[in-house]
Amino acid sequence: MKRILIAPVRFYQRFISPVFPPSCRFELTCSNYMIQAIEKHGFKGVLMGLSRILRCHPWSKTGKDPVPDRFSLKRNQEGE
């Protein structure tokens, strides 16, 4: 199941992301965050990854935002 959820992210990393300049505002890119979240939390990791993508915009804080040990849709406070 996790492989199926991760496959579209790997496709994005391999074929779509290289076409555009780097733009992620966080350390641990959004696509890598989603992969780690899926590996750690299963389907809930997809929700965490989508939440992270929505937080990745020019007006957000930058910096470290590691995948939390517990499911959460908020930014990991340990990363600040």
Swiss-Prot record:
GO cellular component entries: plasma membrane
Keyword Cell membrane carried by entry: yes
Sequence segments annotated as region (Disordered): 61-80
The keyword Membrane is annotated on this UniProt entry: yes
Membrane topology: Peripheral membrane protein
Alphabetized Pfam families for the sequence: YidD
Protein name: Putative membrane protein insertion efficiency factor
Species whose genome carries this gene: Streptococcus pneumoniae (strain P1031)
Lineage of origin: Bacteria, Bacillati, Bacillota, Bacilli, Lactobacillales
